[in-house]
Amino acid sequence: MSTETWNLFVAWAQFLLLLRMLPQCDSAKPCPSVCRCDAGFIYCNDRDLTSIPSGIPDDATTLYLQNNQINNAGIPSDLKGLDKVERIYLYRNSLDEFPINLPKNVKELHLQENNIRTITYDALLQIPFIEELHLDDNSVSAVSIEDGAFRDNIFLRLLFLSRNHLSTIPWGLPKTIEELRLDDNRISTISEISLQDLTNLKRLVLDGNLLNNNGLGERVFMNLINLTELSLVRNSLTSPPANLPGTSLRKLYLQENHMNYVPPNSFADLTQLYRLDMSNNNLTALPQGIFDDLDNLTQLFLRNNPWYCGCKMKWVRDWLQSLPSKVNVRGLMCQAPERVRGMTIKDLNKELFDCKDRIGSNTIHVTTTMLNSLLPAQGQWPVPVTKQPEIRPPDINKIFRTTPIPVKKIITIQVKSITTETIYISWKVALPMTALRLSWQLGHSPVFGSITETIVTGDRAEYLLTALEPESPYRICMVPMETGNIYLSDETPVCIETETAPLKMYNPTTTLNREQEKEPYKNSSLPLAAIIGGAVALVAITLLALVCWYVHRNGSLFSRNCAYNKGRRRKDDYAEAGTKKDNSILEIRETSFPMIPINSDPLSKEEFIIHTIFPPNGVSLYKNSHSESSSNRSYRDSGIPDSDHSHS
């Protein structure tokens, strides 16, 4: 083959290859000018668009259209041709109906925070492969959803309808749904058939609705065999719902309801449950054995319930003490009776539960004589003595008269004000006890003012109150927290009144240092005055000596022949005194005094007479360059007039 033939063949092949590539170039669409495109991701969000721009590339997979003003009319029909689009974000727009003209292969659609009111079967039929549908924060009501609108969306797994206007659960939901969120709606009733087909449902959220026990069907949750999480927070339930699914349920949220009673079998067969929350209800007691079937329970939250720690709750303490360390229980704190308020149930000993024995007619209490001698010395608890058939019951009245109970204060309190903000409290107890409640209140009145209280253990005998108001009265009270001791049945508090120290006596932070600082000044007031007086006298004597020396030398206090030159400077010269910022000033009287500049520059010869004026009472007439003065004379730092600014 010749060279020319070969070159012709190569050129022809290149031409055919170019023709083959031309259709591809024509089919590739550029990115819309208002958007940004990046490998299938089309970003048209936050641009105040009222419609979806045309010309979106065919290879687009995800459309970001949120935070615009797109309405239903702004969705073009050519959007249906984008077969590769699987995710569309259209939240925070102006849609009032479920949009149409969407790509048929979309799997994830975000429509939350619009104003969508109606959902039709035809609109959902256009997206048959939808898996996640987010319709939160719209205006969807039960009547605005067409019956069976979702029935052919057989791939739908997540349906979010939170914060809408639903009064019932939509009918005809597909069996494929795994997560259903209906929180913050107006649902008041759920019939047994509403959820019976949702056998694949794993998470059901019904928070913030109007549900009560009568509005829930008796078997409404029984068919949810794969349900792992059920949330009924912020409803109006008075007890846990019946017939909960026990095969898979792992999380149960019942907080913020009106529950005041828990039936004994409420949690039967919930063997997989590991988290249970019944906080913020009105529960006062729990039936014994309520948690026996919860083999996997590791998190139990019972906060903010008015627990009454009576005899019926003693089993809870025993159960808590037998739990392994992996089980986390929170919120079992006594609110009543008053003697144990603020104490955790787990820390109570058995005597505090007030479980008095139910003694029949053949049992009497013979404790007065025996325990009066034993209890104060040995600290033993009163015990009932059972009557024997052959023993005649003793005369109780006679026993009280022969061995009266000694009247003695059970608690003796002593207080001492330490600083303006602290009070030291100490006390003595006549009988052994487990705990005491200490309270303090600003003011003497037990009615007005907020009360602060704390629980102190029985082995303590002192306490320090801090962060108090200075110079303020306080009422401090203590009351024993016992029930098993017959001498402590009276819960009347023992109170004492005191005041914090005044501010003039104490400094809350540096009191000791301040007192140490005051001592030197108390002893140094006299020497300091003597030093000042001596200095004043010395200055006065020096000035007087200078005047006498001047008069003695010149024969007169005012001389016209006195020369002010640099060669005559001595320590007692007025020029030297001027450099020491003497309190005298120089007044120019006549032009007969020669001025000699310090920098030896020639000046115009002028003669001056300098007269020294002493201000009365030692008042300084010296003015620096920063003080206000009407004089036209400026001063250097040494106090001598600046020769460049002197005037006659």
Swiss-Prot record:
<dbReference type="GO" id="GO:0060322">
    <property type="term" value="P:head development"/>
</dbReference>
<feature type="region of interest" description="Disordered">
    <location>
        <begin position="624"/>
        <end position="648"/>
    </location>
</feature>
<dbReference type="InterPro" id="IPR003961">
    <property type="entry name" value="FN3_dom"/>
</dbReference>
<dbReference type="InterPro" id="IPR036116">
    <property type="entry name" value="FN3_sf"/>
</dbReference>
<keyword id="KW-0965">Cell junction</keyword>
<keyword id="KW-0433">Leucine-rich repeat</keyword>
<keyword id="KW-0964">Secreted</keyword>
<dbReference type="InterPro" id="IPR000483">
    <property type="entry name" value="Cys-rich_flank_reg_C"/>
</dbReference>
<dbReference type="Pfam" id="PF13855">
    <property type="entry name" value="LRR_8"/>
</dbReference>
<dbReference type="GO" id="GO:0008543">
    <property type="term" value="P:fibroblast growth factor receptor signaling pathway"/>
</dbReference>
<dbReference type="GO" id="GO:0005925">
    <property type="term" value="C:focal adhesion"/>
</dbReference>
<keyword id="KW-0677">Repeat</keyword>
<feature type="repeat" description="LRR 5">
    <location>
        <begin position="153"/>
        <end position="179"/>
    </location>
</feature>
<dbReference type="GO" id="GO:0031175">
    <property type="term" value="P:neuron projection development"/>
</dbReference>
<feature type="transmembrane region" description="Helical">
    <location>
        <begin position="528"/>
        <end position="548"/>
    </location>
</feature>
<keyword id="KW-1015">Disulfide bond</keyword>
<dbReference type="GO" id="GO:0097060">
    <property type="term" value="C:synaptic membrane"/>
</dbReference>
<keyword id="KW-0256">Endoplasmic reticulum</keyword>
<dbReference type="GO" id="GO:0007507">
    <property type="term" value="P:heart development"/>
</dbReference>
<feature type="signal peptide">
    <location>
        <begin position="1"/>
        <end position="28"/>
    </location>
</feature>
<feature type="domain" description="LRRNT">
    <location>
        <begin position="30"/>
        <end position="62"/>
    </location>
</feature>
<dbReference type="InterPro" id="IPR001611">
    <property type="entry name" value="Leu-rich_rpt"/>
</dbReference>
<keyword id="KW-1133">Transmembrane helix</keyword>
<feature type="topological domain" description="Extracellular">
    <location>
        <begin position="29"/>
        <end position="527"/>
    </location>
</feature>
<feature type="repeat" description="LRR 2">
    <location>
        <begin position="83"/>
        <end position="105"/>
    </location>
</feature>
<feature type="glycosylation site" description="N-linked (GlcNAc...) asparagine">
    <location>
        <position position="226"/>
    </location>
</feature>
<feature type="repeat" description="LRR 7">
    <location>
        <begin position="198"/>
        <end position="223"/>
    </location>
</feature>
<feature type="repeat" description="LRR 3">
    <location>
        <begin position="107"/>
        <end position="126"/>
    </location>
</feature>
<dbReference type="GO" id="GO:0007416">
    <property type="term" value="P:synapse assembly"/>
</dbReference>
<dbReference type="GO" id="GO:0043679">
    <property type="term" value="C:axon terminus"/>
</dbReference>
<feature type="repeat" description="LRR 10">
    <location>
        <begin position="270"/>
        <end position="293"/>
    </location>
</feature>
<dbReference type="GO" id="GO:0042802">
    <property type="term" value="F:identical protein binding"/>
</dbReference>
<protein>
    <recommendedName>
        <fullName>Leucine-rich repeat transmembrane protein FLRT3</fullName>
    </recommendedName>
</protein>
<dbReference type="GO" id="GO:0044295">
    <property type="term" value="C:axonal growth cone"/>
</dbReference>
<dbReference type="InterPro" id="IPR032675">
    <property type="entry name" value="LRR_dom_sf"/>
</dbReference>
<dbReference type="GO" id="GO:0032584">
    <property type="term" value="C:growth cone membrane"/>
</dbReference>
<keyword id="KW-1003">Cell membrane</keyword>
<feature type="disulfide bond">
    <location>
        <begin position="35"/>
        <end position="44"/>
    </location>
</feature>
<comment type="function">
    <text>Functions in cell-cell adhesion, cell migration and axon guidance, exerting an attractive or repulsive role depending on its interaction partners. Modulates cadherin-dependent cell-cell adhesion and cell sorting. Plays a role in the spatial organization of brain neurons. Plays a role in vascular development. Plays a role in cell-cell adhesion via its interaction with latrophilins that are expressed at the surface of adjacent cells. Mediates axon attraction towards cells expressing ntn1.</text>
</comment>
<feature type="repeat" description="LRR 4">
    <location>
        <begin position="127"/>
        <end position="152"/>
    </location>
</feature>
<keyword id="KW-0472">Membrane</keyword>
<keyword id="KW-0130">Cell adhesion</keyword>
